[in-house]
Amino acid sequence: MALPFQKGLEKYKNIDEDELLGKLSEEELKQLENVLDDLDPESATLPAGFRQKDQTQKAATGPFDREHLLMYLEKEALEQKDREDFVPFTGEKKGRVFIPKEKPVETRKEEKVTLDPELEEALASASDTELYDLAAVLGVHNLLNNPKFDEETTNGQGRKGPVRNVVKGEKAKPVFEEPPNPTNVEASLQQMKANDPSLQEVNLNNIKNIPIPTLKEFAKALETNTHVRKFSLAATRSNDPVALAFAEMLKVNKTLKSLNVESNFITGAGILALVEALRENDTLTEIKIDNQRQQLGTAVEMEIAQMLEENSRILKFGYQFTKQGPRTRVAAAITKNNDLVRKKRVEGDRR
């Protein structure tokens, strides 16, 4: 059911505004522009009377000055006396005055301790220094801070000196810094390019000054190398171009078993490239990608989970998922892959 004012507006729904503006003359258009410039219906800072054109037909009975009106109202409010109270305030207090209850003071009663005669005799004949050592062993800190033990006592050599209120602690074991990575980067790169059979593991961890082109050369050398089984470049400041180079390597390499790219500057795009490359790799069983500079995000984690569900060769995956869904899916996929390897091993032993 339409309201009366809505029925009156229905005839304006199909009006073409462009056609109406085209019929106006230049003088009418200028007049319309002046009206629109003076009025601003959407401005909440203007009073209601200034947001639209005055539509009243009556002539003004007098001038209106808003500032003058405000000053007049303020003056009248200050000159008008406050209304007197119907019941004057006498200051009389009625009712009972609140007095807080005093909390009972807890008094500790000293318990009488009875010792064996031998212990009483030993404590009675013990010197202050021996009692101090005994308190240190028992951990009685109140006795250690007693001023009595700061007084001068006679030592075994007949000289007087203060009992030192210091308990010797255990010596701290020195912790030495880890030595730098001894790997020779250039020599390892040349060995990989020469496909040296003695080089089966390359560890570049924590070497910060390896140039990005050199890391790409390592990835290029791994494409044709048939002996390196484990490659690690954690904390080498590797970025997405390095990750893309290693992704291309994984599509070709048929020997590498383990790859570690943890603690680097690889973003979600680089990680996705590595994950997609695993679909074409049949030999890699372990990959570590955790602790990158920025979080990978939910979309990347879901792609990783889907890849691992389709890949039956990855046995170890190093990454701490932030979402419960991908974490559960990956854990189930890794468990399934390890179970398949165990079943194959058991069947081989039976044969």
Swiss-Prot record:
Transmembrane segments: none annotated. Keywords: Actin-binding, Cytoplasm, Cytoskeleton, Phosphoprotein. It comes from Rattus norvegicus. The keyword Cell wall biogenesis/degradation does not apply. This is Tropomodulin-2. The gene is Tmod2. Neuronal-tissue specific. GO terms for biological process: actin filament organization; learning or memory; muscle contraction; myofibril assembly; neuron-neuron synaptic transmission; pointed-end actin filament capping; positive regulation of G protein-coupled receptor signaling pathway. One of its GO terms (molecular function) is actin binding. Binds to the N-terminus of tropomyosin and to actin. Binds to TMBr3 as well as to other low molecular mass tropomyosins (TM5a or TM5), but not to high molecular mass tropomyosins (TM2 or TMBr1). It is found in: Cytoplasm, Cytoskeleton.
